[in-house]
Amino acid sequence: AGFGYRECPGHPWWDEQEAARQRQEAARWPLHLLSSQPRARLHSQYDHGSVSRATKIQGREPLWMHPSDAQARDIREGSVVKVYNDRGAILAGVHLSEQILPGVVQMSTGAWYDPLDPKEERSLDKHGNPNVLTEDRGSSRLGQGCSAQSCWVEIAPWREELPPITAFDPPKFIEV
């Protein structure tokens, strides 16, 4: 509390400015994406391994979604979708589950970033890293820890040809 930071008053509090900002985002983007730690790897370590790859859907990171949200968007189990907001867009494979609340979707963090066009600043991530969609800001000026791994998004069926996953390809070397 002695640092004088508005966001660190020294006791639990309700941040109405942040709540108002979140309400504005929710009005534009109807689905709340929660990104948790993965069960098949340690953060992003071993994403290239067989255990992690076995969890992918058509090579993409899985996204869990309530069937009613999927039905409203013409999305089916096992299909690939585009998940997007103002910060970017990713591809993900869909699992449907009644255990996910309507209006909420869940993905694990740690899929290796695989931009469709590495030269483009907001290129589509074809592998499914939710960090593309979350805000890049610390939790406070005091701690600079990770902010909550959640954001507001919309989801649409991917109807184009799927681009190949290249995140696991070895680097290209130039011989001199």
Model-derived regions: residue spans:
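Long, low-complexity segments enriched in small/aliphatic residues
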Residues: A1-S50
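Long, contiguous, secondary-structure-rich segments that constitute the structural scaffold
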Residues: S44, H48-W64, S68-V176
